[in-house]
Curated annotation (Swiss-Prot):
Protein name, UniProt field: Protein ORF B
Domain of life of the native organism: Viruses
Organism: Elephantid herpesvirus 1 (isolate Asian elephant/Berlin/Kiba/1998)
Length: 581
């Protein structure tokens, strides 16, 4: 962007847009009054192209988006009428991605008491009409990326999180939602702006399927569309990072503060700009694994989480106390982090380094990566030590366990992005195939259950609905249709009349998809598993027992605090309705 200074009488100050929060600690939009007009707390956005270009990390490196601080007063001249924002965080904004404000005036006015930083710009009348002042108000103070079709302020919150993350300033004060229309427009906007790698766009299209298949957000009710399986990979990672930062900020735990400090030293936006296709040679991924090992050592001092130096390497032991001094710049090249060495747990009785990944339904995706020896070894390793940290940290506080859970989410999102980058080349045909395979396997499981003791009349209806979804999925299915079928499947599963399928102790977040199907495919893929091996108890009951009995919180509270999300959205909608009527 280019800004020209046309005011020679006053002292000039540089101007650049940036991203700040419009949410206060109580999850309300912070608004100030306009001249002769009151700004609503919740803004309803019209179906109009209001595209602010995404500040990609490469732009930061060039210094284009250097932060100069806010203006005390920003005046927008729109169709002959002026409206001024006078607040400490009033940032000048490029409203449209195609129209750059080249008529910006900025000056500093000094009097005896204070210094006022002012900015004046002219908004083209064909870009924004006078009645859309509230849109400019939110855009100006937030620097949010807006796209065609946005309907509620929660969508603005979603994009603020994304832009905040790109600015390396994640905002933990609110939760966000994403609708079908918003997700479709995300893809349109990314392609329209041409600011990201085209291959990355295709990877983002696949996340909705991949995230759903592994069973992370299956507990979302049909009434609320959550960004987990409808959003893109960047947003999913932002949410995990936001929750981590929120827990770290609000917690009194010294361990959490120490772990979060370690993470901030490593996690930057640089990895967003790289297209990665080979997991075995990805230095950032291996660095994340090293960080994970360090965080495990902070919370747990057992030999698995914090092995003795001799058990890893006599010369370059990774210990928490000397991490800053000895490993600040060498984590990615540490000999302990060589890929083959790290994942090979069968050589010389090496120590089982901790794996804190999310409890994913990995056999669902296992067929597609069977030929990859690295990932095959990864899954074997993960399955062996998945519950190590939870079983060793039952004495931790609830927020410390939450911290672990959201670190797992962040790591899992990064791994999923690497995997999709490797598999996807030019389209999302593989996504359709994966989901079709998933549905067919699910239908087989349901039929097997129907032959058992718990026969129920609803089983035939359930099979028919699943078959109907399978018939609609073809290789040229559009992404929008694919997402609709995914949500349709989720609604079918959550129908109360199908609750008889669920054993009582398996009714947690992943439900039937994440438990019954898990055991079915586990035994199908791993013939060496004994029939009396209690897989489901190990995957579901053990984890729920640890959380519910030792920490005294429900599993849904442990994962995402869904109730908190729902209440926040209801408050926004209620504010909106009260202003309409």
């Amino acid at each position: 962007m280019e800004y020209y200074d046309t005011d020679s009488e006053d002292e000039d100050e540089p101007c650049s847009p940036t991203v700040t929060s419009v949410f206060s600690a109580n999850n309300r939009l912070s608004c100030s009054s306009l001249k002769n007009e009151k700004t609503p707390l919740t803004t309803v956005f019209t179906k109009k192209w209001l595209v602010k270009s995404i500040p990609m990390p490469s732009d930061y490196k060039r210094g284009i988006y250097a932060e100069d601080g806010p203006y005390d007063e920003v005046t927008y001249v729109l169709s002959g009428s002026n409206f001024t924002f006078t607040e400490k965080s009033a940032y000048v904004l490029d409203i449209d991605g195609l129209v750059t404000f080249t008529n910006l005036k900025h000056k500093v006015v000094r009097n005896k008491r204070k210094t006022i930083r002012r900015a004046i710009t002219y908004v083209p009348g064909d870009v924004l009409m006078r009645k859309h002042k509230s849109i400019v108000r939110v855009l100006t103070c937030d620097g949010v990326l807006f796209i065609k079709g946005l309907s509620f302020a929660s969508d603005a919150a979603l994009w603020h999180v994304l832009c905040s993350f790109l600015n390396d300033r994640p905002n933990p004060h609110y939760l966000c939602y994403c609708t079908f229309k918003t997700f479709a427009n995300i893809l349109l906007t990314l392609e329209y702006r041409c600011r990201v790698n085209r291959a990355l766009i295709l990877v983002n299209k696949l996340l909705a399927v991949g995230y759903y298949l592994v069973g992370n957000f299956n507990y979302v009710s049909p009434q609320c569309s959550l960004l987990g399986y409808l959003g893109d990979v960047l947003t999913a990672q932002v949410v995990a990072w936001s929750r981590l930062s929120q827990i770290a900020i609000t917690s009194d735990s010294r361990k959490i503060r120490e772990a979060f400090t370690c993470m901030k030293h490593l996690l930057t936006v640089s990895w967003l700009t790289h297209e990665r296709t080979d997991l075995s040679s990805d230095s950032i991924y291996k660095t994340l694994l090293a960080h994970e090992h360090i965080i495990a050592g902070i919370f747990c001092k057992c030999d698995t989480c914090r092995p003795p130096p001799a058990a890893i390497n006599h010369n370059t032991a990774l210990r928490v106390k000397n991490w800053h001094e000895n490993n600040k710049n060498r984590l990615a090249t540490d000999p302990n982090l060589q890929f083959r060495t790290r994942w090979n747990i069968e050589v010389n009785g090496g120590p089982e380094l901790p794996r804190l990944f999310h409890s994913i339904n990995f056999p669902t995706m296992y067929r597609g990566i069977l030929r990859d020896r690295y990932l095959r070894q990864f899954y074997k390793f993960q399955n062996m030590v998945r519950f190590h940290v939870l079983t060793h940290t039952c004495s931790l506080q609830a927020d410390e366990l939450l911290f672990f859970q959201w670190w797992n989410e962040f790591m899992f999102m990064y791994f999923l992005r690497l995997y999709l980058s490797k598999c996807v080349k030019s389209d999302y045909t593989q996504a359709v195939n994966m989901f079709t395979y998933y549905l067919k396997a699910f239908r087989l499981v349901v039929c097997d259950i129907a032959r058992g003791k718990c026969v129920n009349p609803s089983i035939s209806e359930l099979c028919e609905k699943v078959a109907h979804i399978v018939d609609h999925l073809v290789e040229d299915t559009s992404m929008a249709s694919l997402l609709r079928e995914i949500c349709n499947f989720n609604r079918i599963i959550r129908d109360p009349k199908h609750a008889w399928i669920f054993p009582h102790y398996l009714r947690d977040d992943t439900g039937l998809q994440g438990k019954v199907l898990l055991e079915h495919i586990l035994r199908d893929k791993f013939l060496s598993l004994r029939l009396d091996d209690p897989l489901l108890e190990h995957v579901g009951l053990l984890r729920s027992k640890i959380l519910n009995e030792s920490v005294k919180i429900t599993f849904n509270e442990f994962t995402l605090r869904q109730l908190e999300r729902s209440m926040w959205l209801e408050n926004l909608l209620e504010n909106h309705r009260s202003r309409l009527y």
